[in-house]
Amino acid sequence: MALKLNPLASQPYNFPSSARPPISTFRSPKFLCLASSSPALSSKEVESLKKPFTPPKEVHVQVLHSMPPQKIEIFKSMEDWAEQNLLTQLKDVEKSWQPQDFLPDPASDGFEDQVRELRERARELPDDYFVVLVGDMITEEALPTYQTMLNTLDGVRDETGASPTSWAIWTRAWTAEENRHGDLLNKYLYLSGRVDMRQIEKTIQYLIGSGMDPRTENNPYLGFIYTSFQERATFISHGNTARQAKEHGDLKLAQICGTIAADEKRHETAYTKIVEKLFEIDPDGTVMAFADMMRKKISMPAHLMYDGRDESLFDNFSSVAQRLGVYTAKDYADILEFLVGRWKIESLTGLSGEGNKAQEYLCGLTPRIRRLDERAQARAKKGPKVPFSWIHDREVQL
């Protein structure tokens, strides 16, 4: 699970909201609930009252365990199905690529020459490309959060840390495959000499410490819809960084990003198969879950990104990715359109009244998003230049 930017976050879209609890702001002075008669606090005093390691942005009050308990039996009944349809999507470790396959070999006599060649190729890449590539890598490196998120889901979590269930095996093995992505990009960026590794490492630590806010409610229906969307977003974003690396003449980096994109495509296939099976077993519950996630909008895993300086870091990163065409609002709409078609939403029958409403909402949402994006693009002005600590505070246009 990689970049998954939220191109909608910084644009004035007014999608329908779901009936959810209000937002709790953890880093804003609002959370203090001070009476109007209370004396104003200085910024240092407000900072001192914040809990350590709280996210840099507002986090929704969480809804917990929203799936009816009886539906846990659905996932227990899918154990054999998961073994035959999920675990077969995994690659044998001995046949899998490893980061070292794409990097200079430190044990070889030609190591220094190989590093020199890598750095020469990296010099041809512009700063804005590095901003997006670093953002990709940071998001990949927050993998502990994503495994944690999957293990919040009722009925499929790894209950022991080494559970033999098909669901638990999938989560651990998926994590193991994903772990190579951040490792590879991290080492490439380190060797490139183009970035401030300490600032990047701080950002990773902040992000893992902050967690993520996907609003999946311990509900595997919501969770697997979320991962289906995100894996496709990852496939698109890494595919675009591969294409642009090739355009800039770095064929080795293009191979790196393309290889990661291929992994994400395979993972997308697995997660979309789960939801497809849920539509077969429980079309009413699944279509309502899909509509619920889209009403809430898909929050991106790295949306709590922070480097210790810029609390708008994720929004700025998203703006650069949008401008470069790495991941855009159009991609968001394309993913939704793809999933609506993949899961045959229009042809669902026998739904309840609420299920029919969810179906109608989903079938009309992609055109609406496209119209809103077109209006936003028509109003869009050229963005300012802002410094990014990841590239030694060099400025990049948003």
UniProtKB/Swiss-Prot annotation:
GO terms for cellular component: chloroplast. Coiled coil: none annotated. Residues 1-34 form a transit peptide. Fe cation 2 binds at E178, E231, E264, H267. It is an enzyme of class 1 (oxidoreductase). Its cofactor is Fe(2+). Pathway: Lipid metabolism; fatty acid metabolism. Fe cation 1 binds at E140, E178, H181, E264. Keywords: Chloroplast, Fatty acid biosynthesis, Fatty acid metabolism, Iron, Lipid biosynthesis, Lipid metabolism, Metal-binding, Oxidoreductase, Plastid, Transit peptide. It is found in: Plastid, Chloroplast; Plastid. Its EC number is 1.14.19.2. It comes from the Eukaryota. One of its GO terms (molecular function) is stearoyl-[ACP] desaturase activity. Binds 2 Fe(2+) ions per subunit. SUPFAM superfamilies: Ferritin-like. GO terms for biological process: fatty acid biosynthetic process. It catalyses: octadecanoyl-[ACP] + 2 reduced [2Fe-2S]-[ferredoxin] + O2 + 2 H(+) = (9Z)-octadecenoyl-[ACP] + 2 oxidized [2Fe-2S]-[ferredoxin] + 2 H2O. CDD domains: Acyl_ACP_Desat (cd01050). It holds the Pfam family FA_desaturase_2. PANTHER family: ACYL- ACYL-CARRIER-PROTEIN DESATURASE-RELATED, STEAROYL-[ACYL-CARRIER-PROTEIN] 9-DESATURASE 7, CHLOROPLASTIC. Homodimer. Converts stearoyl-ACP to oleoyl-ACP by introduction of a cis double bond between carbons 9 and 10 of the acyl chain. Belongs to the fatty acid desaturase type 2 family. This is Stearoyl-[acyl-carrier-protein] 9-desaturase, chloroplastic. It comes from Brassica napus (Rape).
